[in-house]
């Protein structure tokens, strides 16, 4: 492990401690580029980017893991590690053989078009090899050419390309231990075009883009230098998330800079997701400060202010021809907004939500009033505990009981703070069943390395995630591990009951070394290993998470060690 994080300043240690207790807070800030400079920086290739088309993957049906909706059986199973663990969407749960070899069979329920297969062998498993077959009808097995006695690397995800035109209902995985010990498989994936995934919105929070470009950062995708906006769009993103503060310090995310970014986003052919924080600076479960200009207002006055402010903001976007498509009334509002007036001190007490509900209703009313006639505006309520169902259900039930109108359940899900991907899946499925609303992962990240990256600009700041104990079992801190985690997360959303899985947004994919987390500190970014670009701004495989994983892995240079490809 790199030792730089161990030398972190005491102030930064406090940040990590608070984040670990409550979730990844968003009070870490950097200066913003003047709004007038945003448009030329972000739209130099707008015409070409716009030609990609609407929706993820530029109109092509995205690839997802069909095994999640299938069933599994095995001829050799160790007690406590059933076959179903291999297709639950979580590489941290295992199917284990009870002998040196065993065969796992997946039934997808119907014949599917398949592009490739994915396998993660548990990191504690002995080294092993595997043979894979597929069949369109029971018993008519066809060998997979690239998976005949292929070596598996414990702990590292592997992708096996299938012959073009493969259609199958069944997939059979036979594993052979190299040592004679039992073999444990974390996940066996069957990837193919999934119409449910085509309905997902895919985007990222690009609020740092202007600062990075101003600092001299350069971003490349397969050797072509482009803006992060262009690169994300080319890889299927159809949304950009942007934060908004009321009256931030000069250069920060204010209305003028957001309007400029919105023009760039629209020019690139994407939609706008506005995160209204109702604060002059970062707002999250630890900070929800009333803006300076609103200080001293009581509940009635704040209610009026919130409604008029929200209406003015939404109207401003509409007037310049870039209407907002989705708005979050507050950011990670588990403990309320506009403290202390709208604070939730006791989440178990329904009466504690009275003031919050009043303020949220005002925000929704303002957003609806500012939205132009005929334009669809989705309203989100954003909760941070994406892996905790009991807390999530209680929060949204209180909002529903109070009559707060909203269209979308937004969740932050950082596995190093919010639990396993299985817990996230259980949460989104249960929320869909209880509330019958669209569900969006509004913020997510996973590390591609544990090293503290250095760019030509330089950065010695410790990272949010710096040690193996913070990783999710089955997902190494590598480009391949990051891709594996995000494809599993996306596949889970595509399988949410009743098609209510609505979208996935990656937080700060371009916050690479060179931009400090607080102006004037000279510290840098603690996010450098959680991006979708390496420290030199080169796009990582996860940029292409909607595509065939085997093809994505094969298209990257070996020096980057993106993932292991069989065959």
Give the role of each language-model region:
Residues 228, 374-378, 390-471, 480-481, ...:
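Glycoside hydrolase catalytic-domain groove-lining segments
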Residues 204, 275, 327, 409, ...:
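Conserved, mostly hydrophobic/aromatic
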Residues 37, 52-109, 122-126, 147, ...:
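Disordered, acidic Ser/Thr/Pro-rich linker "stalks" and the adjacent N-terminal cap
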Residues 196-231:
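Boundary/entry segment of secreted carbohydrate-active catalytic domains
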Residues 4, 12-50:
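Secretory targeting and sorting signals
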Residues 214-217, 426, 430, 449-488, ...:
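Aromatic-rich peripheral "rim/lid" segments of glycoside hydrolase catalytic domains that contact
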Residues 230-379, 384:
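Substrate-binding cleft and catalytic face of glycoside hydrolase catalytic domains
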Residues 77, 98-101, 123-193:
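Trp- and acidic/polar-enriched beta-sheet ligand-binding modules for extracellular glycan
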């Amino acid at each position: 492990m790199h030792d730089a994080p161990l030398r972190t300043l005491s102030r930064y240690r406090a940040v990590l401690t608070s984040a670990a207790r409550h979730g990844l807070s968003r009070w870490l800030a950097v200066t913003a580029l003047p709004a007038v400079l945003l448009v030329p920086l972000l739209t130099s290739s707008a015409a070409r980017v716009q030609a990609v088309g609407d929706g993820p993957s530029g109109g092509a049906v995205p690839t997802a893991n069909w095994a999640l909706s299938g069933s599994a059986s095995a001829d050799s199973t160790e007690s406590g590690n059933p076959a179903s663990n291999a297709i639950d969407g979580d590489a941290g749960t295992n199917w284990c053989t009870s002998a040196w070899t065993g065969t796992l069979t997946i039934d997808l329920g119907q014949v599917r078009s398949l592009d490739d297969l994915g396998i993660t062998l548990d990191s504690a498993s002995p080294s092993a090899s595997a043979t894979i077959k597929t069949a369109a009808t029971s018993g008519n097995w066809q060998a997979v050419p690239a998976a005949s006695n292929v070596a598996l690397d414990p702990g590292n995800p592997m992708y096996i390309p299938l012959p073009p035109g493969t259609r199958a209902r069944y997939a059979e995985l036979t594993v052979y231990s190299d040592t004679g010990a039992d073999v444990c498989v974390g996940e066996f994936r069957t990837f193919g075009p999934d119409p449910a995934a085509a309905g997902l919105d895919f985007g990222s929070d690009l609020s740092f883009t202007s600062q990075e470009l101003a600092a001299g950062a350069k971003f490349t995708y397969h050797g072509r230098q482009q803006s992060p906006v262009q690169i994300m769009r080319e890889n299927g993103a159809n949304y950009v998330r942007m934060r908004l503060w009321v009256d931030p310090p000069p250069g920060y995310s204010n209305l003028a800079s957001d309007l400029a970014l919105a023009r760039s986003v629209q020019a690139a052919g994407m939609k706008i997701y506005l995160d209204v924080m109702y604060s002059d600076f970062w707002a999250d479960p630890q900070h929800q400060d009333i803006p300076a200009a609103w200080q001293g207002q009581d509940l009635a006055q704040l209610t009026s202010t919130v409604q008029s402010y929200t209406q003015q903001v939404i109207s401003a976007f509409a007037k310049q021809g870039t209407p907002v498509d989705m708005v979050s009334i507050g950011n990670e509002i588990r403990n309320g907004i506009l403290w202390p007036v709208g604070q939730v001190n006791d989440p178990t007490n329904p009466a504690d939500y009275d003031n919050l509900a009043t303020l949220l209703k005002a925000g929704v009313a303002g957003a609806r009033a500012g939205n132009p006639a005929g334009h669809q505006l989705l309203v989100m309520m954003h909760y941070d505990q994406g892996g905790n169902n009991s807390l999530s259900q209680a929060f949204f039930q209180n909002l529903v009981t109070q009559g707060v109108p909203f269209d979308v359940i937004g969740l932050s899900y950082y596995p190093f703070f919010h639990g396993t991907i299985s817990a996230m899946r259980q949460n989104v499925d249960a929320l869909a069943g209880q509330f019958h609303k669209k569900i969006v992962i509004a913020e997510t990240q996973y590390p591609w390395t544990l090293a503290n990256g250095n760019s030509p600009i330089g950065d010695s700041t410790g990272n949010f995630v710096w040690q193996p104990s913070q990783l999710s079992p089955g997902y190494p801190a590598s480009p391949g591990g990051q891709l594996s985690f995000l494809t599993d997360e996306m596949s889970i959303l595509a399988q949410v009951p009743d098609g209510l899985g609505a979208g996935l947004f990656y937080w700060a994919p371009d916050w690479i070394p060179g931009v400090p987390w607080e102006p004037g500190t000279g510290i840098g970014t603690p996010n450098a290993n959680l991006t979708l670009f390496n420290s030199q701004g080169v796009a990582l495989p996860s940029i292409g998470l909607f595509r065939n994983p085997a093809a994505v892995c094969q298209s990257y240079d070996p020096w980057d060690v993106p993932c292991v490809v069989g065959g």
